[in-house]
């Protein structure tokens, strides 16, 4: 679904160098550029429903990718013996329990994703 969304939005919104790279190398435009193109097109009434759906898929993929990165950082902090209190302070969380809850949620999110985001990228 993510790859199909990237392809659709590249075909619809690539221009300039991005269009040349798509036509010659089938290089997809970056996800955030694609999403911004859709929001701009929607604001001017030019976006189609399929464009909006594809952009939403990419937003979800980006969110998952960031959650997986955050989980890796929590794991690295744990490996360095960084205390939950310190993590909570950095993240502006109320307490160590909140940091531990966040880490558990991220671990569950990683498990739901299968641990390997595969085609995820931002």
Protein language model regions, located:
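Alpha-helix initiation and N-capping motif
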Residues: 32, 49-52, 96
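Short, Lys/Arg-enriched anionic-surface-contact patches
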Residues: 46-70
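General nucleic-acid-binding
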Residues: 1-46
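Short alpha-helical "packing" element that flanks the helix-turn-helix/winged-helix DNA-binding module
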Residues: 73-74
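Glycine-rich, often proline-containing surface loops adjacent to acidic residues and nearby aromatics
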Residues: 53, 81-83
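Short, Lys/Arg-rich amphipathic alpha-helical interaction segments
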Residues: 83-122
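Short amphipathic helical patch at the helix-1/turn junction of helix-turn-helix
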Residues: 77-79
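Short, solvent-exposed charged binding patches
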Residues: 40-42, 57, 122
